C-alpha cells in the first residue's frame, strides 16, 4: 500500500515499491482500488500512447489510488514494454538522484565523474535494459523530486528513451520543468476524484462478493471520504475484529465502526502524526478526545495561526454554522489517536478544555454534551449526575441508545436525578427493541420517588410506562386504567394546599392525552379517539400548546389514512410539512412525521412518494447505530412489494433482514420475512417464498398495529400467490375485521387482494368499501370490483390504466389478464389484443402473474408476429419474403391470418397491437 497516497505528506523513503500484501479481507489490498480504477488506468494508457505525448501525470487527493492506477496502467502493457518503477524521497530531502539510487549503483565508476556522465550513463543503461523495447517509467511522489533526478528524467523524455507516468497531489507540486511540459501539452494530466457513494457500494459488492446494504456503503463512504485504499483498510479491520459479518447473503455490521488500528491504518496515522509540530499534535489529541469543539473554545487554547494552518491543510474542518464547530478532517484519525492515548493523557487534555462546569450545562449543545460525556468515559471517570442525565437525554434525542444507557448507568438510586435517568434508560431500551428491559428500568423507580415527581415529571413517567406496557402482551390491556389513575393523581394535585401550578397541570394533562392517542394508534383502535384527536389537532386558540397540536395532527393524519380518508390525510400531511421548520427543536418530531407520512402515502398507493419521504427520516435519524438503516431498507422493500415490484424489493429486504437478524428490533424481523416471502412469490420463486413464509410464521411477537397488519397482509398475499386455498378466506376475514373497526382503507386493501378469484358477493363488498374511501386507489378498487362483477373487458382495461397511473405493476397485470379473458369470451378481438399487449409489456417486471389468463397461448404464432412487425414498419411483401426466407405467397397468407386474428384491415394498425 502506498503510504504517500494516504499521508499528509510523503512519509516513506523507499526507492522501489514493496511487494503487494494480502489483505485481511477477501480481496488483495491493491485490488480494492483496482475495482474502482480500471477505467482510469485505461485513460492513462490512452493518453500515454498519444503521438505527441511524453507522458502522463496522475493527480488527486491522498488515498484516491494514484499509485495503483499507475501500476495498473503499467501492467496492461505486457512484456513487450519495458517498465521501471521509481519513488522519490520525502519532501525536504535533497538526496541527489534519490529516486534513481538503485540505477546509480549499477553504473561503472567511469560514469560517475560528473552529472553529465551520470546522465549519459543512466540513459545508456536503460536503453540496454530495454533491448529495443519501448520503455515506460512510473514515478511515484513526483512532487518531491530532487533537481538532479529531474534533469535525468527530462533527458530520458526529450531523447524519447522513455515515457513517464508520474503521480502528485497537484500539478503545481511538480518541478517547474515538468509543470511547463504540462502547460505545453507534452505531459497530459489525469485527475482522480474520490469514490462516490454509489461507486463505494459497487466496490464493496465486487470485493466482498455478496450483497452490501446501501446504508453500510453510505456509512463506510462517510468514514473514509471515498478513498478506496482507506476503504480496504477499514473493511479489513472490521472483518478481523468480527464486527463486519456475512449474515445470510448480506454483509452487515454487528455494532458501530470502532477503529483500534490493528491493521495498516495505524501505521499510516502514526506516520502522519509524527510529521506534525508539537502544537498541531496537541490540537489533534484534543479533537480526537473531544470529537468536536466550537471554534471559540479551541481558539482560547491555541493560537489562531496554528488553527488556520491546520484548516488550510485539511487536517481540521470548521463548519459554517453560527457556532463554527471544529472536527478532524478524517474521523478515522481521531479514533486511532484516541485509542493509543493513555488515560492520564486524556484526563490532562480534558482539564484544559473550558466550558464543562456544572453551572454551564445550559450553555452546552446536544453535541457538546455527548462529546464531553464520551471524553469522560474514555478517561474511565464518572460523570456528575447532572451531566450524566443531560448526556443520556441528548443521546436518546440523537438515537444513540447504547451511549444513553452508558450515561444513565452511572446514576444511583440515591441521586436526585435517578427517576428521570431511568426514564431515559427506558427510552433507550425501547430504541434497541427491548421492551422488557425498558419496563424493568421504570419498575426500579420506587413509588415514593414517583410520588415526589412534579406534575409534568409524573405525567412523562406515566407516558413512558404506557409506551413500554403497550409492547408487553400481559400488560398492554392495562394501559387505559394506568392513564385513568394518573389523571386522578393530577386532579388530586390541583386540590393540594398549596395547589400545583395550573399551567404545569395543563401541560401534564396534555402529555397524558398524547400518550393515550399514541396507545390507541399503537393497537390500531382509531374510532374511540377520533373526535378528541381531531379536536386536539385542529384547535388553535390563544393559550393552546402548538407542539401538542402538531404532535396530535401527526397521529391524526395516519388515523385518517387508515379509516378511509386518504385525501384528508394527505392534505393534513402537506399542512404539517409546511409547519415543521418552525419546530425543528422538538425532539424527533421530523422522524415521527416522516415515518407516519410514509404509511399515509403507502396506503394511498403512492409508493414512490413514500420512498422519497424516507429520505427525510433516514437523513435525520441521528448519530446512533446505523441510524435506523434496517428500518429504512425494510420500508423501501415493503413499498416495492406493495407496488408489485418484487424483483426490486429483494435487495433492500435482504439487507434489512441481515441487519435485523443480528440485533433485536421490535419484531420488524417478522415483517421483513413476510415482505420477502411476498417479493419472492411475485418473482415466481416459490421455493424461497415458502422458506421466508415459514420464517415469518415462526417469528411471532408484539408489534405496532401498522407493522402487524402489514405483516399479516404480506403473509396472506404470499400464501395466495403460492396457491394456498385458505389464503383468500383469511384475507376476507381480515377485511371484515378492519371494516368493523372502521379501518376502511385496510379493509379495502385486504379484500382487493382476496378477490383475484372473487365471488359476486366479494366484489360487492369491495365496491362498498371503495365507496367509504377517498383517492385514486379507492377509485381503482371500485373500477376493478365493477369490471370483475360484470365481466366487462372495457372496464377492466380502464382499471388497468388506473393501476398503470399509480405504477402498481402486479395490479395492472391482474386487470389486464382479466380483461383478456373477458374480451376473448365476448369475442372482442381488439380489446383482447390490447390486454395481451399490456401483459407482454409487464412480462419482465411481473414474471409470475397474480392470475393467469384462461387462454395462455399467444394470439399470433412466432412467424406471424415476425411478419406483422415488419409489415407494420412499412416493409413490402417482397422484402419480407427475402428477410424471412419464404415465398411472397406465404407472406400474404400469414398477413391474412394476422389481419383476421387481430381484427384490423391495414398495416398501419399493426404496430400498436404487436
Give residue ranges: language-model regions:
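Internal alpha-solenoid helical repeat scaffolds
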Residues: 75-79, 157, 176, 181-183, ...
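Conserved phosphate-binding/catalytic loops and adjacent sensor/switch elements of nucleotide-binding enzymes
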Residues: 20-21, 29, 33, 59, ...
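Extended alpha-helical scaffolding segments used for macromolecular assembly and cargo binding
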Residues: 55, 72, 305, 344-432, ...
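Alpha-helical sensor/transducer elements of the RecA-like P-loop NTPase core
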Residues: 68, 121, 148, 152-216, ...
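Alpha-solenoid helical repeat architecture
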Residues: 95, 281, 321-325, 329, ...
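Short secondary-structure boundary elements
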Residues: 62, 203, 207, 211, ...
Amino acid at each position: 500500500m502506498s503510504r504517500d497516497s494516504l499521508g499528509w505528506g510523503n512519509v516513506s523513503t523507499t526507492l522501489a515499491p514493496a511487494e503487494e500484501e494480502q489483505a485481511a479481507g477477501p480481496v488483495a489490498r491493491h485490488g480494492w482500488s483496482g475495482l474502482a480504477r480500471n477505467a482510469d488506468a485505461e485513460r492513462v494508457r490512452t493518453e500515454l500512447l498519444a503521438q505527441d505525448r511524453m507522458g502522463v501525470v496522475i493527480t488527486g487527493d491522498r488515498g484516491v489510488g494514484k499509485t495503483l492506477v499507475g501500476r495498473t496502467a503499467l501492467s496492461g502493457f505486457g512484456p513487450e514494454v519495458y517498465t521501471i518503477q521509481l519513488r522519490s524521497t520525502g519532501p525536504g530531502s535533497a538526496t541527489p538522484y534519490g529516486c534513481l539510487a538503485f540505477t546509480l549503483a549499477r553504473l561503472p565508476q567511469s560514469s560517475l565523474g560528473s552529472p553529465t556522465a551520470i546522465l549519459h550513463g543512466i540513459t545508456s543503461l536503460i536503453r540496454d535494459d530495454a533491448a529495443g523495447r519501448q520503455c515506460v517509467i512510473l514515478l511515484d511522489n513526483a512532487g518531491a523530486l530532487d533537481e538532479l533526478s529531474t534533469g535525468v528524467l527530462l533527458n530520458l523524455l526529450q531523447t524519447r528513451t522513455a515515457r513517464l507516468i508520474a503521480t502528485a497531489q497537484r500539478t503545481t507540486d511538480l518541478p517547474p520543468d515538468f509543470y511547463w511540459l504540462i502547460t505545453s501539452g507534452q505531459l497530459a494530466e489525469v485527475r482522480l476524484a474520490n469514490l462516490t457513494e454509489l461507486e463505494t457500494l459497487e466496490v464493496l459488492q465486487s470485493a466482498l462478493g455478496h450483497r452490501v446494504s446501501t446504508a453500510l456503503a453510505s456509512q463506510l463512504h462517510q468514514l473514509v471520504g471515498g478513498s478506496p485504499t482507506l476503504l480496504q483498510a477499514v473493511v479489513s479491520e472490521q472483518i478481523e475484529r468480527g464486527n463486519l459479518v456475512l449474515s445470510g447473503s448480506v454483509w452487515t455490521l454487528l455494532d458501530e465502526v470502532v477503529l483500534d488500528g490493528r491493521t495498516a491504518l495505524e501505521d499510516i496515522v502514526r506516520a502522519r502524526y509524527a510529521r506534525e509540530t508539537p502544537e498541531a499534535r496537541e490540537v489533534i489529541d484534543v479533537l480526537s478526545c473531544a470529537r468536536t469543539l466550537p471554534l471559540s473554545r479551541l481558539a482560547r487554547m491555541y493560537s489562531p495561526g496554528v488553527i488556520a494552518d491546520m484548516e488550510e491543510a485539511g487536517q481540521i474542518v470548521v463548519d459554517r454554522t453560527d457556532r463554527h464547530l471544529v472536527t478532524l478532517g478524517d474521523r478515522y484519525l481521531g479514533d486511532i489517536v484516541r485509542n493509543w492515548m493513555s488515560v492520564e493523557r486524556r484526563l490532562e487534555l480534558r482539564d484544559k478544555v473550558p466550558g464543562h462546569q456544572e453551572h454551564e450545562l445550559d450553555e452546552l449543545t446536544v453535541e457538546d454534551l455527548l462529546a464531553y460525556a464520551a471524553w469522560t468515559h474514555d478517561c474511565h471517570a464518572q460523570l456528575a449526575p447532572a451531566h450524566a442525565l443531560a448526556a443520556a437525554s441528548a443521546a436518546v434525542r440523537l438515537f444513540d441508545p447504547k451511549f444513553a444507557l452508558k450515561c444513565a448507568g452511572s446514576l444511583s438510586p440515591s441521586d436526585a436525578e435517578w427517576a428521570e435517568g431511568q426514564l431515559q434508560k427506558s427510552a433507550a431500551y425501547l430504541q434497541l427493541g427491548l421492551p422488557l428491559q425498558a419496563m424493568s428500568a421504570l419498575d426500579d423507580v420506587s413509588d415514593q420517588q414517583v410520588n415526589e415527581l412534579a406534575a409534568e415529571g409524573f405525567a412523562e413517567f406515566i407516558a413512558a410506562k404506557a409506551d413500554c406496557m403497550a409492547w408487553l402482551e400481559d400488560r398492554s390491556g392495562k394501559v387505559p386504567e394506568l392513564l385513568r389513575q394518573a389523571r386522578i393523581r393530577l386532579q388530586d394535585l390541583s386540590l393540594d394546599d398549596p395547589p400545583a401550578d395550573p399551567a404545569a397541570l395543563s401541560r401534564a394533562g396534555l402529555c397524558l392525552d398524547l400518550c393515550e392517542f399514541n396507545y390507541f394508534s399503537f393497537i390500531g383502535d382509531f374510532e374511540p379517539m377520533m373526535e378528541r384527536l381531531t379536536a386536539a389537532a385542529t384547535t388553535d386558540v390563544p393559550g393552546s400548546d402548538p407542539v401538542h397540536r402538531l404532535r396530535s395532527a401527526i397521529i391524526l393524519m395516519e388515523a385518517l389514512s387508515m379509516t378511509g380518508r386518504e385525501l384528508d390525510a394527505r392534505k393534513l400531511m402537506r399542512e404539517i410539512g409546511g409547519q415543521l421548520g418552525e419546530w425543528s427543536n422538538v425532539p424527533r418530531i421530523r422522524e415521527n412525521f416522516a415515518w407516519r407520512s410514509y404509511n399515509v402515502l403507502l396506503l394511498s398507493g403512492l409508493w414512490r412518494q413514500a420512498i422519497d419521504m424516507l429520505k427525510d427520516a433516514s437523513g435525520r435519524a441521528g448519530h446512533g447505530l446505523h441510524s435506523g438503516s434496517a428500518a429504512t431498507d425494510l420500508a423501501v422493500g415493503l413499498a416495492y412489494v406493495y407496488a408489485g415490484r418484487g424483483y426490486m424489493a429483494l435487495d433492500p429486504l435482504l439487507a434489512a433482514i441481515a441487519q435485523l437478524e443480528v440485533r433485536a428490533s421490535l419484531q420488524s424481523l417478522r415483517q421483513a420475512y413476510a415482505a420477502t416471502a411476498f417479493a419472492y412469490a411475485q418473482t415466481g420463486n416459490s421455493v424461497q417464498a415458502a422458506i421466508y413464509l415459514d420464517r415469518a410464521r415462526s417469528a411471532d411477537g408484539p408489534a405496532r398495529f401498522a407493522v402487524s397488519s402489514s405483516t399479516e397482509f404480506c403473509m396472506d398475499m404470499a400464501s395466495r400467490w403460492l396457491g394456498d386455498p385458505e389464503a383468500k378466506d383469511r384475507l376476507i376475514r381480515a377485511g371484515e375485521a378492519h371494516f368493523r373497526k372502521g379501518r376502511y382503507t385496510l379493509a379495502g386493501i385486504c379484500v382487493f387482494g382476496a378477490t383475484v378469484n372473487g365471488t359476486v358477493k366479494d366484489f360487492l363488498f369491495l365496491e362498498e368499501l371503495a365507496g367509504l374511501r377517498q383517492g385514486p386507489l379507492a377509485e381503482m378498487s371500485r373500477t376493478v370490483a365493477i369490471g370483475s362483477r360484470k365481466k366487462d373487458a372495457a372496464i377492466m382495461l380502464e382499471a388497468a390504466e388506473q393501476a398503470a397511473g399509480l405504477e402498481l405493476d402486479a395490479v395492472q397485470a391482474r386487470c389486464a389478464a382479466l380483461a383478456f379473458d373477458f374480451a376473448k369470451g365476448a369475442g372482442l378481438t381488439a380489446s383482447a389484443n390490447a390486454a395481451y399487449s399490456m401483459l407482454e409489456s409487464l412480462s419482465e417486471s411481473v414474471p409470475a402473474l397474480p392470475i393467469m389468463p384462461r387462454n395462455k397461448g399467444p394470439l399470433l404464432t412466432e412467424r406471424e408476429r415476425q411478419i406483422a412487425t415488419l409489415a407494420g414498419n412499412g416493409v413490402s411483401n417482397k422484402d419480407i419474403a427475402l428477410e424471412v426466407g419464404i415465398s411472397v405467397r406465404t407472406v400474404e397468407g400469414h398477413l391474412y391470418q394476422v389481419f383476421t386474428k387481430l381484427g384490423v384491415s391495414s398495416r398501419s394498425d399493426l404496430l400498436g397491437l404487436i
